[in-house]
Amino acid sequence: MNKKRTPAKRVDIVLLKLVKERSVLYETRKISNLYDAYRLVKNFLVSDREKFVVVCLDTKNQPVSRGTVNSAIVHPREVFKVAVLSNASKIICFHNHPSGNMDFSSEDEEITKRLQKCGEILGIELVDHIVIGDDDKYFSFKENCKI
């Protein structure tokens, strides 16, 4: 019996840490409606580039963290990484349209469906996905029965 030994493979051991970049004071402590959530993120969405912001909530709808995906192309892996590391039970997603037009695109609708599906698998509810336009105008996927 002449068994050939397979060479050993090196496996990386990785430690992930959530590092607080900064904090914001949120006076109402709880997200009771869409406007509460918008007030928490509106300053992060003022940009000439498209930004995607995730608000992570606990079971009492209290914000536990806020994360930003610095890309127009959003992958559920990046969105839920923030949520999982924050021990969130729910998320609300926001993104701006620098053009000021708050109408959603087919890509916006597709990523919303993907986020909802991934959230169901992970046990993290997608509460809403909101597209922000000019002058505090917005499109809510939930209010328009798209979630």
PLM features: residue spans?
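N-terminal beta-strand/alpha-helix entry module and adjacent surface
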Residues: M1-N87, E109-C118, L122-E125, G133-I147
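Short, solvent-exposed loop/turn segments at secondary-structure junctions
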Residues: P98-D103
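Short beta-strands and strand-loop turn motifs
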Residues: I91-H97
